[in-house]
Amino acid sequence: MIKFALALTLCLAGASLSLAQHNPRWWGNRNTIVHLFEWKWSDIAEECETFLAPRGFAGVQVSPVNENIISAGRPWWERYQPISYKLTTRSGNEEEFADMVRRCNDVGIRIYVDVLLNHMSGDFDGVAVGTAGTEAEPSKKSFPGVPYTAQDFHPSCEITDWNNRFQVQECELVGLKDLNQHSDYVRSKLIEFLDHLIELGVAGFRVDAAKHMAAVDLEYIYGSLSNLNIEHGFPHNARPFIFQEVIDHGHETVSREEYNELGAVTEFRFSEEIGKAFRGNNALKWLQSWGTDWGFLNSDQALTFVDNHDNQRDQGSVLNYKSPRQYKMATAFHLAYPYGISRVMSSFAFDDHDTPPPQDAQENIISPEFDEDGACVNGWICEHRWRQIYAMVGFKNAVRDTELSGWWDNGDNQISFCRGNKGFLAVNNNLYDLSQELNTCLPAGEYCDVISGSLVDGACTGKSVTVNEHGYGYIHIGSDDFDGVLALHVNAKV
């Protein structure tokens, strides 16, 4: 009986830790993450203070923080080829990173680090030099900056069969030297690295290439991490938020279900399907059942996004900033519909898959610059600064914890729905106007459309909608309007 009780206690403790790792540790009613891809730490700190916090963002996913290989031309993907766990990259050094984390936490913005636990750098001709000046010989699996030697890696082999579990989890992903996470020594170095970031005040981690590591090894690593640092405003015994990159199209041996109990999982099917819908390849009327009915993970297990730094560069259904009208409609739907843990993308312009972030002649990443409307210039796209997107972050905050209700569609590509009695969204993806009296579910009054403008000094700078005592209002979205979406919420009532 004593043995049974002990086993039950350990089982419950493990379940409790796993559930805790699904909690993003947001501040207040905020509930949207932004990925500031390849931004410098000093610029993120300022963005937290001057833009993200005032507009209600919840957190920032940052690019990998550890030393990486220096590749010719400085492609973005060099950040995903570790040389050591020293916190020096083109985004800044450890002191600058720590300052950024502190300043963002001070204004209620949580930091989530993209971490590389699966591998080190791939082959390099001769001695490679990292962004902190550390030398390594990847072809010999020699990384003195950690240190790792060949015995800390799986034997070299290629992934040729994605239905072969051994190949997927023990061979080299695109030639990257594959760490043996079952080794006590490797585990200790990874835990030490993550714990140092926790000590500096981060709230959690995006785990790159999680499907290429055995779930049992990740479970051990996650379970061995320290609690979040209470000096940065986290409650006692709070666990780091974990969200794992698991690309699962539903037909491979390694599945997302192996990982979703350990933490959230990146729901790539969400990205693909929302792209198909707003590109016109699937009628919007079908989105009424959006979520688990589409084969997605449970809402609290799914990290959701329209695009990410990888798939925005691929050909296919995924939307990106280059289709701005459809992208803004898809993002509005994403942030208005009650499903998933939402993340929005903040990109830099690219012409090909390898385009580096904006940089000067000395290959230093340059800071974003802004025009008079606050939009980014000089090579940065900054979708999070588009009014139509940051306004929907405010919408999502305003309607938090409300249910979907009042669904309407025209049988095709015009839809609307309510979020309780706090918010209303309408979308027109048809080639003709939407002009209709619709139930907004809102209290009577005049509301500003936060897509076309905002509430300033008691007046709307864009469209407005008058809602009658029955909750109905006249909604017009022209087929040639600049934006194909309209959004109202109680915090934008005149």
UniProtKB/Swiss-Prot annotation:
Residues engaged in binding chloride: 206, 308, 343
Protein name: Alpha-amylase-related protein
Gene Ontology biological-process entries: carbohydrate metabolic process
Reactions it catalyzes: Endohydrolysis of (1->4)-alpha-D-glucosidic linkages in polysaccharides containing three or more (1->4)-alpha-linked D-glucose units
Main localization of the protein described in the UniProt heading: secreted
Cofactor note: Binds 1 Ca(2+) ion per subunit.
Transmembrane segments: none
Xref: Pfam families: Alpha-amylase, Alpha-amylase_C
UniProt xrefs under SMART domains: Aamy (SM00642), Aamy_C (SM00632)
Metal-binding as UniProt keyword: yes
Gene Ontology MF terms: alpha-amylase activity; metal ion binding
Signal peptide: 1-20
UniProt EC number: 3.2.1.1
Gene3D superfamilies for the chain: Glycosidases (3.20.20.80), Golgi alpha-mannosidase II (2.60.40.1180)
Quaternary data: Monomer.
Protein encoded by which gene: Amyrel
Disulfide bridge positions per record: 48-104, 157-171, 376-382, 418-441, 448-460
Record site feature (Transition state stabilizer), residues: 310
